[in-house]
Structures are given as C-alpha cells and as structure tokens.
C-alpha cells in the first residue's frame, strides 16, 4: 500500500481489500530498469488483529504480483511475502529484513544467479518524511544492507534508456556480428532490428534469437524431481 498501489478512498490504510488502485507510474519506472527481480514485502498486522481475513487478503496480494509480472515481462522475476504478525521482534516484520533475506536466498536457489545486497534497491513509502506514518521501509533497507529511495523520488527520476543484448535461445549466448563484435548495449529498436535480420538470415527452426536486458543471465536448469518407477498393473477380472 502506497508504493505499488494506492487506496481509492484516499486513506492511509485501505477500508477493505477492494479499496485499491494500481500505481502505474511506479510500474512504468520499474519496467525501465529491467531488474532481475522485484521482491515485494509488506507488513499486514491487520490480519493478526482480525481487521482483514487472510483468505481475503491473499488474492489481493497475488493479483498485484500478477499485474506487475504481466506488465514488466518474464525476464524479471516478481515475487512477494507479507508478514501478518505485530510482534516487532518477529524476524519477518519490517523493519526487520527477514522477508527480503528469505526471498533473495530463494531467488538464488531457483535461478543460480547471485545478487549482492549492495546491488539491491528498496523503494517504499515509509521513509520517515513529513506526513508519512513511519520510517519502517527506510529502516528495513538499512537493516538489510541496500540503498533506498522514497517512491515519490523514484517516480520523479529521469531514467536512462534501457539497453539490451541479442542472444540465441538454444544456449543463451550473446550473438556476434560478422566482425565478431557482440550484439549488446543496444537500444530496444536496434535490438529488434538485429533480431529480425538474424531470423531472416537463419530461417531454420533450430536457430532462434531474441533480445534481453543487459543484466539478464542464463538461469540454471531446475532440479529434476525423482520420478516414480513405472509399475505394470494387472487387472484380474473378478470370477463370476
């Protein structure tokens, strides 16, 4: 609340799960960054106090995650956790960094990509500024060990045009041109033109190309769960 969504009522805290609208200006800024991951953390102590039922809040939370994932694209992982507890000592209640630490570790486990805490940026609306209800987001960033921006400052920033690289879908390797120069640090329009040229020059279905953000890395193959052995089932009809 206040960072990715706002209340329609204009109140600091929503009157119900229906009292929300997406902050598309924040969505747009996040998309320009092309981050490897967007990890959403939210204190929801109202659940423990009985103000909102978890069965009502969870679909709202999932909806916001799904909206951002759909908008920002599949090259960025969007995930989230919320803390329903009010105990200030609970490791997952902001300003404690437990939720961020859990999700960053899970991201590394699932993708094989390691992101250092100092390379992360936290964006929030509880920055301790005049008129704000708290500084819990700012303190969370400090406790986690990453940089911080208030959401208003973030949306007002002039961000540079994102850059891309062209890769082979078969192995994720960056494609090189005829002069052996890697096709990277391209604008989106330049990358699109390069992909179109490569697809026309290589019509074979096994040669497919696309462009991805410069920060994109090839994720590792997910661990294969053990498969049960096939069993032959003999159906013995019951004798009459």
Task: For each feature predicted by the language model, list its residue ranges.
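Substrate-recognition element of Asp-dependent hydrolases with the DxDx(T/V) motif
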Residues: 26-61, 76-89, 123-126
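Acidic, Mg2+-coordinating phosphoryl-transfer loop and its flanking beta/alpha structural elements
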Residues: 121-160
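Active-site neighborhood of HAD-like aspartate-dependent phosphohydrolases
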Residues: 1-39
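Alpha-helix N-cap and loop-to-helix initiation/capping positions
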Residues: 16-22, 52-60, 94-95, 132-136
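Short aromatic-glycine-(Arg/Gly/Cys) micro-motifs in beta-strand/loop hairpins
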Residues: 160-180, 211
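Conserved Lys-Pro-Asp/Glu-containing loop-to-beta segment of HAD-superfamily phosphomonoesterases
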Residues: 92-135
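Short, mixed-charge low-complexity intrinsically disordered segments
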Residues: 192-239
């Amino acid at each position: 609340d206040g960072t990715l969504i706002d209340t329609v009522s204009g109140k600091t805290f929503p009157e119900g799960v229906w009292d929300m609208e997406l902050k598309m200006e924040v969505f747009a800024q996040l998309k320009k960054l092309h981050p490897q991951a967007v990890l959403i953390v939210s204190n929801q102590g109202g659940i423990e106090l009985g103000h909102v039922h978890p069965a009502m809040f969870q679909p709202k939370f999932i909806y916001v995650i799904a909206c951002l994932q759909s908008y920002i694209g599949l090259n960025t992982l969007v995930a989230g956790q919320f803390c329903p507890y009010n105990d200030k000592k609970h490791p997952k209640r902001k300003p404690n960094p437990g939720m961020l630490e859990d999700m960053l570790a899970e991201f590394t486990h699932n993708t094989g990509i390691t992101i250092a805490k100092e390379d992360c940026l936290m964006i929030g609306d509880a920055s301790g500024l005049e008129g704000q209800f708290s500084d819990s987001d700012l303190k969370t960033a400090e406790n986690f060990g990453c940089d911080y921006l208030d959401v208003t400052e973030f949306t007002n920033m002039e961000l540079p045009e994102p850059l891309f690289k062209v890769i082979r879908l078969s192995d994720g390797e960056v494609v090189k041109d005829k002069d052996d120069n890697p096709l990277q640090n391209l604008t989106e329009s330049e990358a699109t033109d390069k992909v179109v040229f490569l697809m026309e020059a290589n019509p074979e279905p096994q040669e497919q190309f696309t462009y991805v953000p410069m920060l994109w890395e090839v994720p590792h193959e997910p661990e294969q769960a053990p498969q049960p052995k096939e069993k032959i089932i003999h159906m013995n009809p019951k004798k009459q």
